[in-house]
A protein has these predicted regions:
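Beta-barrel outer-membrane channel/assembly domains of diderm bacteria
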Residues: 3-128, 147-161, 203-208, 214, ...
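Acidic/polar loop-and-plug regions of large Gram-negative outer-membrane beta-barrel proteins
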Residues: 176-189, 197, 213-266, 363-385
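Short, solvent-exposed loop/turn and secondary-structure capping segments
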Residues: 34-36, 89, 134-135, 172-174, ...
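Internal, well-ordered domain-core segments that constitute the primary functional module
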Residues: 120-226
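Active-site beta-loop-alpha junctions enriched in small/polar residues
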Residues: 26-28, 164-166, 217-221, 295-297, ...
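C-terminal outer-membrane beta-barrel translocator/porin domains of Gram-negative envelope proteins
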Residues: 320, 342, 348-397
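Secretory-pathway/luminal and periplasmic proteins that interact with or process carbohydrate-rich
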Residues: 66, 131, 352-354
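A charged, solvent-exposed segment within the mature domains of Sec-exported extracytoplasmic proteins
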Residues: 308, 328, 343-346
Length: 518
């Protein structure tokens, strides 16, 4: 299909459309153990190994982008994602014979400009991130269907408006009339009240080396927006809103988190959502770079739920599905000839110990914070295995402080970045009594919200990234990562009935990635 498409390029080019092809190959190999527990014991005392995955991983991907440029005012773009293909895995085309079908459309949009104005519009499947500073967006950085328009009032001030539709018409309704899938409102017809829509305004202001972009976003989600399998099982390429928008710590009905016994239905047709942010970047005092970012989020309750206390069937509490909180992060760097030293930190609100008023952790749709590259989304934002990064991209319910030496270079074409960061929790230890096991704290790892940290818990992360630029468009990236586990056993190994236990361990990774860009 792709070959046939590109063969058509010369004929179309003769009609004054300039086709441009760009892309990149990634080949990744790694060794890792990314589970924070070595063994767990369930409520019956059975010892279970936590990680049965191979320690060695090898996979590849290809991103291929085709731009059809008619003029500076009109163009179209399509990006294909071939892979990721795990080497040796047949369904992904990685086994002997290599005939698997694993081609996806990553982006497909058009850019156009209103004549004689500065108004530029992009519409279609595209990547869009809310404005951020100090290491990525803690709220929203996602590909999907949207329209955004930008206008420059002058060289210093502009305005961007955006409509984004993450989900619609995924609820199958009648397929769950007996409730076997655990869907709520299963008397509703298929496709009824199942859309999620987000609307945002951004005001970028740049003056004298200072950039400030205040923004606000309002959203609505229908009461059936979460009622489909991919949402509930977090089976998305990007984002896990079943976890990051809700207070449960897990996919609804998925276990591992709050000890929920029943999800209440709601008579509401739609629930509201709201976020606001203020990212600031200051480069006035060169060689200093100062950045900070403050975010707030709120998701309206869409029904209540019942949760056991201390795993006791006779002690049931009623909880709210509301989630509301804030997060602030900052970065200060000083550029030197041989390196750029920097300190960074963050603080996010945490749960107060009660489920009655919902969660006090900041909600998000698809966060990608990259202050670090093991727990976060740093470095290449890709790895030989999905567990090698993105363990906690939201930072909700945590605080931390770190130090880094970035872009160190002692040999031509070879750079290094060293980073150390301490992660602490801001959630009340009283929340443990609502969990379904002593190891529920790890239920959100790899689901964008990392281990659930109380104020008694901590993690210490180390990153070492080495990049060798062999050619202008080809580099070799070697990364080592380690996270020391300081989860508090006294807090989590409570003597609850059938609560289980665990043996904690540190996690580590070593990955080697070859990247060719053209």
């Amino acid at each position: 299909m792709l070959a046939a498409l590109f063969l058509c390029v010369p004929a179309v080019t003769s009609q004054a459309v300039d086709f441009q092809i760009k892309g990149q190959w990634n080949m990744g190999f790694g060794l890792a153990d990314t589970k924070f527990t070595s063994y767990i014991r369930n409520g019956s005392g059975t010892k279970i190994k936590s990680n049965n995955n191979d320690r060695f991983a090898a996979r590849q991907r290809l991103l291929l982008q085709l731009d059809a440029v008619a003029s500076e005012s009109l163009s179209g773009t399509v990006m294909f994602h071939i892979g990721p293909q795990k080497w040796g895995f047949g369904p992904q085309g990685g086994a002997m014979g290599a005939d698997g079908v694993f081609v996806k459309v990553r982006q497909a949009y058009i850019d156009w400009k209103v004549p004689d104005t500065t108004i530029q519009t992009r519409m279609g499947i595209q990547n869009f991130a809310m404005p951020y500073a100090a290491g990525g967006s803690a709220v929203f950085d996602l590909r999907g269907a949207s329209i955004n328009s930008h206008v420059d009032f002058n060289e210093n001030i502009g305005l961007t408006a955006m409509w984004f539709r993450p989900y619609n018409d995924n609820y199958t309704g009648s397929n769950d009339t007996d409730g076997t899938n655990g869907y709520l409102n299963n008397n509703d017809n298929a496709g009824y009240l199942d859309n999620m829509d987000l609307f945002a305004l951004m005001l970028p202001v740049n003056y004298g080396g200072v950039s400030v972009t205040p923004w606000a976003r309002y959203g609505v989600q229908g009461r059936n927006a979460h009622n489909f399998d991919d949402y509930r099982t977090t089976n998305f390429v990007d984002g896990a809103p079943a976890v990051t928008l809700s207070p449960y710590l897990n996919a609804m009905g998925g276990g591992g988190g709050l000890n929920v016994t029943d999800y209440g239905r709601t008579s509401k047709a739609y629930g509201g959502m709201f976020w606001a942010g203020l990212p600031v970047k200051i480069k006035t005092f060169d060689p200093w770079n100062i950045e900070f970012d403050v975010n707030y989020g709120w998701v309206e309750s869409m029904g209540r739920f019942d949760v056991k206390t201390r795993n006791d069937d006779s002690d049931i509490r009623r909880g709210s599905s509301k989630r509301e909180g804030w997060l602030a992060k900052a970065l200060v760097e000083y550029k030197m000839d041989w390196s750029t030293p920097g300190i960074f930190g963050w603080y996010g609100s945490g749960d107060d110990g009660s489920v009655k008023n919902g969660s006090e952790r900041m909600p998000s749709v698809c966060p990608y914070v990259w202050m670090t590259s093991f727990m976060g989304d740093g470095n290449l934002a890709w790895g030989p295995n999905g567990d090698y990064l993105d363990l906690n991209d939201s930072m909700a319910g945590t605080w931390g402080i770190g130090f880094q030496l970035s872009d160190m270079s002692f040999v031509d074409k070879l750079t290094h970045t060293f980073r150390v960061a301490y992660w602490g929790g801001t959630n009340s230890p009283s929340m443990v009594k609502y969990m379904d096991s002593a190891y529920a704290w790890q239920s959100t790892s790899n689901l964008f919200e990392g281990p659930y940290l109380t104020t008694n818990d901590g993690l210490l992360e180390f990153n070492l990234v080495n990049v060798y630029q062999m050619y202008e468009n080809f580099n070799i990236n070697l990364e080592l990562g380690y996270v020391a586990n300081f989860m508090d056993n006294d807090t989590w190994k409570k003597d609850y009935n059938n609560f289980g236990s665990y043996e904690k361990q540190d996690i580590w990774k070593a990955q080697l990635i070859f990247t060719y860009k053209f």
